Amino acid sequence: TTSIASPDPEPVRRCMEEALDHARLRPEDIGYVNAHATGTVQGDEAEARAIERLFGAATPVSSLKGHMGHTMAASGALELAACVRMLAARRLAPTRNLDNPAPECSGLFLPRRVLPLESGALIKNNFALGGVNCSVVLRRFTHDE
């Protein structure tokens, strides 16, 4: 990101693209985006714009912070474990307590209830102050591989 006061969606988008490249997947292979959702206007807007540019409006996007709070340094690991569980259960959790999404999120598919996770792949974002960006692609294990 450009700065803490003015995050830029381009590095966020590139981070997700690089994760997809490493996984040898395309955006259309991803069935769910687990957003970092910092809860800051600037951070959430940059992440929402980057997700919309890369995945469009059809891929479900939610955050788990409404379920467990922002656990600071542990948030990435805890949310990653929850994403593994969602893949195994083939169900994705909506963002809890999201009553009025910001206008900047209007181009995203924000599920309001638990949905089936049709795809065998998801991407999980984790971002920190100063431009420390991390996106991880998870794929469901199959015995074919």
Label each region the model flagged.
Residues 1-145:
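Conserved "HGTGT" condensation-loop signature of ketosynthase/thiolase-family condensing enzymes
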